[in-house]
């Protein structure tokens, strides 16, 4: 991976994201110099699932209603079962995703993450 210094990545997730599908990519992005912000449907913290059990929490940097695509260079959509079910029906989340596609910015989706792309009608 080339250096991501000076790049800012949005990670859009909600309660029930699969722990490894958020934590591992975030760690990799940060290790390459990227700034990563967690965007969610609510402020505070969101809770991970590890398999079928609730697990770690992560702090939310901004709500999706506050976040703007123009502040980011790329978007990551982690999977999990509960997470995409919430994100894909949120109107602000759908708009946020569509805005990345309208500007031809990179979007990565893991596991069940592409469900949001389907609801946003970008794939």
Each PLM stretch: what is its role?
Residues 1-103, 115-123:
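Extended, subdomain-level signal for the structured scaffold at the beginning of enzyme domains
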């Amino acid at each position: 991976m080339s250096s991501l210094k000076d790049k800012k990545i949005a990670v859009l997730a909600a309660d029930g994201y699969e722990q490894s599908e958020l934590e591992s990519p975030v760690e990799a992005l940060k290790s390459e110099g990227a700034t990563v912000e967690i965007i969610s449907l609510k402020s505070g913290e969101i809770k991970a699932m590890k398999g079928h059990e609730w697990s770690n929490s992560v702090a939310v940097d901004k709500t999706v209603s506050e976040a703007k695509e123009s502040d980011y260079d790329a978007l990551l959509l982690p999977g999990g079962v509960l997470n995409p079910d919430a994100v894909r029906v949120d109107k602000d989340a759908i708009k946020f995703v569509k805005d990345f596609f309208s500007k031809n910015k990179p979007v990565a989706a893991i596991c069940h993450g592409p469900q949001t792309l389907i609801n946003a009608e970008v794939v």
